[in-house]
Swiss-Prot record:
This is Adenylosuccinate synthetase. Substrate binds at residues 295-301. Pathway: Purine metabolism; AMP biosynthesis via de novo pathway; AMP from IMP: step 1/2. Binds 1 Mg(2+) ion per subunit. GO terms for molecular function: adenylosuccinate synthase activity; GTP binding; magnesium ion binding.
Amino acid sequence: MSKADIIVGIQWGDEGKGKVVDKLCENYDFVCRSAGGHNAGHTIWVNGVRYALHLMPSGVLHPRCINIIGNGVVVSPEVLIAEMAQFENLKGRLYISDRAHLNLKHHSLIDIAKEKLKGKNAIGTTGKGIGPSYADKINRTGHRVGELLEPQRLCEALIKDFEANKTFFEMLEIEIPSAEELLADLKRFNEILTPYITDTTRMLWKALDEDKRVLLEGAQGSMLDIDHGTYPYVTSSSTISAGTLTGLGLNPKEAGNIIGIVKAYATRVGNGAFPTEDKGEDGEKIAQIGKEIGVSTGRKRRCGWFDAVAVRYTARLNGLDALSLMKLDVLDGFEKIKICRAYEYKGMEIDYIPSDLENVQPIYEEMDGWDKVFGIKDYDLLPENAKKYIARLEELAGVKVKYISTSPERDDTIIL
């Protein structure tokens, strides 16, 4: 019996998980998404071509990989169908859990309306309706992908839901779709998606029993976890390694190696605590060189220095076996590079994450920069200062680096 290896982001998302998964996919039979929705975005570059994935597992770019969208994901049929249109021959290579919850148009309308009502206290969601979809799930009023197999029955259930919440929708100025319009959409979803809907948990159990190689692909980042992130400025699902298991119906004994994906600096989209944010020239330089624009939202990412306190925290949360250090090349040409080694908090120096992270100040150490690592594929060819930087990050995080990315391209990766 084999075990499932896990890839997780360990900052605030956008760490470069897509490139790592894409690089590793050739060694796996199954690649699986476990949580989130189309608020998450993976960018993968292959031979100069950019692929932006939101719901599809990154294994879709490898013809021999079977791709699974697990029960923990909230699925927008509209978005998924549009994404599927980019690819050919998906039958037999893509499966969607019948237990995954649906993310429908009214969810995004609720999301946007509620954010507007919050004004300056808005969380900064993507507006994709992910929170409202998970809220329906937790309230036990949601609808699942398997219900698409009976579109007439699902339509009737949704109309009843809309009528029961009519006052709420009117307050948010959301127009309720007609039964005819809704049924037409559901029938279209049914026609296209039915061949892909199945019990993916049983499929994965069988795969592991048959010693197939399985890779679980986390979405977003550990500092956005609903329980362990910078609440309330978090996502609506578990983004740590344990969450990937529940989001696919696997047990803890079925977990294999766990790799944490981390940028050589730090970024964050939306509001919330971000201790190492640099609002000056260096932060702007990182944003420009790193092309730090959100894949799902098009919003500019906030940029700053590597936060070793946060990474050490998430390394323990996830039980990491190794790190994959991404976008090291973005720091090419910086004379000095900062690392946050600790925080100042209520007059004390601390090395942990308090629940009120917005009240800390970073304590930095500086290291000398380097000229260029872009495109290097051999560790021995890295500049000495880059090697020292990597070694210091390993020391502070308490986890060894196994992969180093030196450009957006799939093959520009150092394996240690």
